[in-house]
Amino acid sequence: MRPTEACCYLKISLIILFYMGCYAQKHPNMDIAVILVGTTEEVAIKDVHEKDDFHHLPVTPRVALVTMNESDPKSIITRICDLMSDKKVQGVVFGDDTDQEAIAQILDFISVQTLTPILGIHGGSSMIMADKEEASMFFQFGPSIEQQASVMLNIMEEYDWYIFSIVTTYFPGYQDFENKVRSTIENSFVGWELEEVIHLDMSLDDIDSKIQNQLKKLQSPVILLYCTKEEATYIFEVAHSVGLTGYGFTWIVPSLVAGDTDTVPDEFPTGLISVSYDEWDYDLPARVRDGIAIITTAASTMLSEHNSIPQSKSSCNNIQESRVYEAHMLKRYLINVTFEGRNLSFSEDGYQMHPKLVIILLNQERKWERVGKYKDRSLKMKYYVWPVFDLYPNSEEHKDEHLSIVTLEEAPFVIVEDVDPLSGTCMRNTVPCRKQIRPENRTEEGGNYIKRCCKGFCIDILKKIAKTVKFTYDLYLVTNGKHGKKINGTWNGMIGEVVTKRAYMAVGSLTINEERSEVVDFSVPFIETGISVMVSRSNGTVSPSAFLEPFSADVWVMMFVMLLIVSAVAVFVFEYFSPVGYNRCLADGREPGGPSFTIGKAIWLLWGLVFNNSVPVQNPKGTTSKIMVSVWAFFAVIFLASYTANLAAFMIQEEYVDQVSGLSDKKFQRPNDFSPAFRFGTVPNGSTERNIRNNYLEMHSYMVKFNQRSVQDALLSLKSGKLDAFIYDAAVLNYMAGRDEGCKLVTIGSGKVFATTGYGIAIQKDSGWKRQVDLAILQLFGDGEMEELEALWLTGICHNEKNEVMSSQLDIDNMAGVFYMLAAAMALSLITFIMEHLFFWQLRHCFMGVCSGKPGMVFSISRGIYSCIHGVAIEDRQSALDSPSATMNNTHSNILRLLRTAKNMANLSGVNGSPQSALDFIRRESSVYDISEHRRSFTHSDCKSFQPEENLFSDYISEVERTFGNLQLKDSNVYQDHFHHHRPHSIGSNSSIDGLYDCDNAPFTTQPRSLSKKPLDIGLPSKHPSPQIGDLYGKFSFKSDHYGAPDDLIRSDVSDISTHTVTYGNIEGNAKRRKQYKDSLKKRPASAKSRREFDEIELAYRRRQRSPDHKRYFRDKEGLRDFYLDQFRTKENNPHWEHVDLTHIYAERADDFKHDTSCSNRQHQKHVGEFVQTDRKHGSGGNAWEKNMSNIEWEDRASSNFCRNCPSKMHNYTGQNTNRPACIRCEVCKKAGNLYDISEDNSLQDLEARPIQAPNSKYPQSPNGKAQKRNRSKLHRQHSYDTFVDLQKEDVTLAPRSVSLKDKERFLDGSPYAHMFEMPNETSFTSKSHGPTHNPGGYMLSRSLYPDRVTQNPFIPTFGDDQCLLHGSKPYYFRQPAIGGLKGRADFRGAGKSLSAQHSGPSGHFQKDICIGNQPNACVSNNKNPRSFNNSTNGHVYEKLSSIESDV
């Protein structure tokens, strides 16, 4: 016996003696048999325990040591039964040195039969046994099938072997093994791939060929095998024949296959991995001791709880019921055992819950080597990279297919993370990488390492290169240093790993430089980098002058120069010299006292525009100045927008950033010159430090004390203010700046790079991998995959913002464009200024058709547009337009002529700056005319110049177009139209008509009211202050049945081009049309409404019922007298007939007028223009004021009827009707009834030359009298457009009169409108004449659109319009008691008589017609007959219908 064996045997003897000594004590004893099967040498290798190991337990174990050499089932059963009979054994600890799993089956059978706990601690007794009996009390020191399958999968997961196959025989437990593997991979997050599952039947004949055929299906690199050791020997032999046991294939087997580690079959391949029970750290004496402790501890627990322990078994037969109960109770305690702090519990199947397992590897020496340990569900392997090349002696030829690659953690190129806590492995987008830990007391069995997961920009590149080049790899992290630095001739870091050939490649943020290229090969750079500088933002302050900083001083000065000197002066000059500007109107006297446009106003206007201030400004009127202001407004938009956009960068609290130009900057080269000193550093042992050391030695020596251990430490130092700048690789710094929280870290110059280089892959020198790797990298660039990776990994959230606040002032170069625009606008304005004057003074009249005598281009275009819109046919032949066939029923022809007339009115000379002064055409009318209506005086109709407008008759034309569709072509629908002056601008405006004495008075800013068709009593200022003339307007009773006259029927051939909205019907009874009228007033110009607003008050006052003993006087009598004296005073260059001295009327009117009753019945009317013309014809000696007519003569005149269009007497008139029919016309007028007959003047002149015999009056209230001949002036008819030019060339002595009372300077001499306001030259007043009932000349209306007289003007409004609209103003009359002759009279006839008497002059004779104001029928009739309304009026006032001639 060898000494060692004797020593082990002595130890076991001492243990037995110890337990026997415990038996002698009073504690209850537990008999336990320890059976060891094997040779003497094996049995002798045992250990001895301390005597006091179980001293603390209440049950004392009594151990019996039994050794035997036979391992057959019969010998084992016989030996155990003998021990039970002899020793009363209560428990068995069994160990053997065989690989026979049959021993475990025999022991399981004995435990079921004897209900004795048996523990298999070694050899065959501890091997896997499937399908134990239900009542079995056999426990094994070993892992179960499921536990071993889990460890095998953990090994594969550790080395990322996810593709595998399963090969099993039909040995019991194979289904459990297969099911465990399947359930694990199905419930795992790891991407397992189970390719094949093969079941081999070892009992078949010709098994070799069948196994070969099945094994040939295997293609996976990892194969899991479950079988017995004998079956495995045969399977490996067949697998070797088919090439499945060499390089590239890894077999993993359970402990059942490995068996006894001391015996290794030759068929087992090298590199075989097995899961085995730990025999290195858990030897047989320790197992024996733990076996005894488990049984003793369970019995002690049972004793403490139940005060009993299982009784010993006397034999293997006759099992008592009490024994069964006690056995089951003991098994429950055996499952849960803890001894000396170690968990020795078992599962229900009898396997240890926490077995001590190891992973063993069959190395090249054909010995089992422990390469890993599995404890507490944690696997630790010896090799962080599987030593595949060390296992196969002929594997040099396969080294190119599996590579070991080293890397270095540095985001974003390599990012290291922990494994997934749920699965314990890496996710799919990561790659397993291992970091080795080298402890000081490292054992021979190998070092420790930590499994991590790597991802990042370089890892993705590595995966794509490996897929392209087709190689596998194991990745690990470098431990000795960083990128690599040569220290004392030895390289460390990743370069050192490649140089020492521990790694084939180095992948990461490895900079290519010359020194490294001498020892390793670099691939082409996959990213460009260099040296960059990172700084931290620091808060700043806002400057007090920040609001001026958006523009430089030059821009501010230039803007004010352009504003004050250039633009404002230019606008002022253009406006001053503009023909339609403010100052030109002042210079021409067209707007005395009106506004002026000064240079101060120009500056204020431009200042308000450039700063967008809502201030009251005065806009220019000239076209050139408007263009200049418009361009300035565009300049202001650009200027203000640029200022506002750039202001935000200066008004915010700016963040200060240190600016450096490069490594040569003085902040780096002379950092101590600054206060405080500039602090900067880098990470040592890198290419950045090497570059600085080689090129800037002083800089390197200064920065050493500020160097940082890592990039993360440097970032913290920057944020905390310990470091002012950090110098490092540009790619890394750009990534860190983009991912920085708060974006406080920035790289200077938005990532400016110095000493540009790149990152590459380091490869072993002359290994042959460089070309393949270069081609793979270039392919990534070509496919665009490299750009995708850069966008994925190298872009941060802060990259979307500006890294620095780089605000700069806008200089002249930035704003030059807008100043160029102003200069171009100045040049364009000069050209426009010249063209404006050229057109205004030279070309304007030609465009309007004055030069050619034909319709101008503007009119032609307007007519064409109107024709296209309204479908009106245009007559091409001029004769067709002017022929008599174009009668009143020809609507289209009349429309065309109306448009031509409107065009002619718009093109009148004297409008819009005509060189002919308007003062030359002021018409002086009678004083009676001016007395009746101050505000309608021709001489003083406006105190301020008329402001020309673009379309003078726009309101008239729009009124015609608006009312055309509602006109009826029936003579029964007759009316008399009203003429309104052109609308003034606004009440109180600079262009409004001022009063006779005060231009600011409201009545003189309004339009006159028509007084036609109603006899009015005229109140003149009395010579004596006590008596007063009654209210002229208040004498009317508008609803009286006696309101009428022979001329009462309204003529239907007169046109209305007024500013009134024309309707017809009862105002009160027709609410709908009244509402339409009100709505139209809302759309009227403000000027058209304002006149009516004032007239409504005045007319309401005048319509108020008055007593007959009241009369009116004008307030300023003396001023009125002086006005008329000056009006009729002869002036230079004016004919005598325009100045008639009427002062004798006022001087002699008192008593003669008052007591003369011969004129009380005067009813005929005489226009002022008639006796003025008569006065010119007969001279001063035959003044019309001195002639009188008797009552008989007046009655004779009244008994005759006259043509409605001319002064011809109708001899066949019966005189039965009180109202003269509107259809009565003489033969000559019927012949000349063509509206546009150009020869009608000749026929009318002949007609005027014939004497007229008035028949006896048939009026019921008028006495018969003789007719008196009347001296008549020549009748001037207005002409159609065709003769317009010819008439202009004639020397017409009569001064023209504008259609609008306000626009006096519209017409030149010879204009077709020269006779518009001229009354027929009737016979002057005679001393014996009585008021005739009718004056045919006073109410003549022309069918021409260019009438001869005011009563023939189709555009003059009638009094009926004012009846409906009731406009007025406050009265300007005094009331005083009427003269005695008017007492008791409520109507206006008495007032008319008194008024006539006062006007009769010294001789007591009166004029036939007393004319009042500028009214369409301006003569007051003294007709006694009551005037009645139309039979259909029912006493109501009717609004008129608009018309364009009677046939429209």
Curated annotation (Swiss-Prot):
Membrane topology, as annotated: Multi-pass membrane protein
Keyword Zinc annotated: yes
Positions of transmembrane segments: 555-573, 628-643, 820-839
Keyword Signal: yes
Residue ranges, Extracellular side: 25-554, 644-819
Sorted UniProt keywords: Calcium, Cell membrane, Disulfide bond, Glycoprotein, Ion channel, Ion transport, Ligand-gated ion channel, Magnesium, Membrane, Metal-binding, Postsynaptic cell membrane, Receptor, Signal, Synapse, Transmembrane, Transmembrane helix, Transport, Zinc
A GO BP annotation: excitatory postsynaptic potential
Binding, Zn(2+): 122, 279
Region (Disordered): 1254-1277
Matches recorded under SUPFAM superfamilies: Periplasmic binding protein-like I, Periplasmic binding protein-like II
Binding site for L-glutamate: 511, 516, 687-688, 729
Tissues of expression: Detected in oocytes.
Predominant location: membrane
Residue ranges, compositional bias (Basic residues): 1267-1277
InterPro entries: ANF_lig-bd_rcpt, Glu/Gly-bd, Iono_Glu_rcpt_met, Ionotropic_Glu_rcpt, Iontro_rcpt_C, NMDAR2_C, Peripla_BP_I
Gene Ontology CC terms: late endosome; lysosome; NMDA selective glutamate receptor complex; plasma membrane; postsynaptic density membrane; postsynaptic membrane
Catalytic activities: Ca(2+)(in) = Ca(2+)(out); Na(+)(in) = Na(+)(out); K(+)(in) = K(+)(out)
Subunit structure: Heterotetramer. Forms heterotetrameric channels composed of two GluN1/zeta subunits (GRIN1), and two identical GluN2/epsilon subunits (GRIN2A, GRIN2B, GRIN2C or GRIN2D) or GluN3 subunits (GRIN3A or GRIN3B) (in vitro). In vivo, the subunit composition may depend on the expression levels of the different subunits.
Function (record text): Component of N-methyl-D-aspartate (NMDA) receptors (NMDARs) that function as heterotetrameric, ligand-gated cation channels with high calcium permeability and voltage-dependent block by Mg(2+). Channel activation requires binding of the neurotransmitter L-glutamate to the GluN2 subunit, glycine binding to the GluN1 subunit, plus membrane depolarization to eliminate channel inhibition by Mg(2+). NMDARs mediate simultaneously the potasium efflux and the influx of calcium and sodium.
Name of the protein this chain belongs to: Glutamate receptor ionotropic, NMDA 2B
Taxonomic source organism: Xenopus laevis (African clawed frog)
Organism lineage string: Eukaryota, Metazoa, Chordata, Craniata, Vertebrata
